[in-house]
Amino acid sequence: MDEVLIGEVIKPHGVQGEIKVYPITDNPKRFRKLKEVILVQNQEQRRLKVLHANVHQSEVYLTLEGINTRDKAEAIRGWAVKADRDQVPPLKEGWYYFELEGMQVYEGDVLLGTLAQVIQTGANDVYLVKGDKGEICVPALKTVVKHVDVAGKRMDVELPPGLIDGEELR
């Protein structure tokens, strides 16, 4: 099953094993609906039931089955927190970054490369596309991104004039 990175364990909270999690989302309230998380560090994975999730502003606190002391919570400090893809609610519009990363990006029939990273700039996101000829920063604008096929892992773009030297990639 596909897993999605949703946060990182920052530190224990209290003495009964509750953990503070740094959420990797713009909506931390999503943690309240989780039934289970996967804690990951290096090659080790632990799948644990979520007993309670508390969200205060942008801070997330989780109580997990089997983590019931401060020492056990301390032992998972720095671990990645993941969830099964089917626990991530669909967006009303748009895509999650993890759905975009790894897509093949095309302009017409020309493969520009693979979308390696979504960069948040404030004004609009930028897609960092890495290909045989180097890196291209593609603005995430409706005028540029013409089609996204999440299932097919393909994005079609129409680059603005002057963004790249067209002959370099063709």
UniProtKB/Swiss-Prot annotation:
Keyword terms: Chaperone, Cytoplasm, Ribosome biogenesis, rRNA processing
GO MF terms held by the record: ribosome binding
Main location (coarse class): cytoplasm
Start and end residues of each PRC barrel domain: 92-163
One of the GO BP terms on file: rRNA processing
Signal peptide start-end: none
Subcellular location: Cytoplasm
UniProt keyword annotation of Isomerase present: no
InterPro entries assigned to the protein according to its UniProt record, in alphabetical order: PRC_barrel-like_sf, PRC_RimM, RimM, RimM_N, RimM_N_sf, Transl_B-barrel_sf
A Pfam family that the UniProt record links to this protein: RimM
Gene Ontology CC entries for this record: cytoplasm; ribosome
Functional summary from the UniProt entry: An accessory protein needed during the final step in the assembly of 30S ribosomal subunit, possibly for assembly of the head region. Essential for efficient processing of 16S rRNA. May be needed both before and after RbfA during the maturation of 16S rRNA. It has affinity for free ribosomal 30S subunits but not for 70S ribosomes.
Entry comment, domain topic: The PRC barrel domain binds ribosomal protein uS19.
UniProt subunit comment: Binds ribosomal protein uS19.
Family in the record: Belongs to the RimM family.
Name of the protein this chain belongs to: Ribosome maturation factor RimM
Organism whose genome encodes this protein: Desulfitobacterium hafniense (strain Y51)
Species classification: Bacteria, Bacillati, Bacillota, Clostridia, Eubacteriales
The encoding gene: rimM
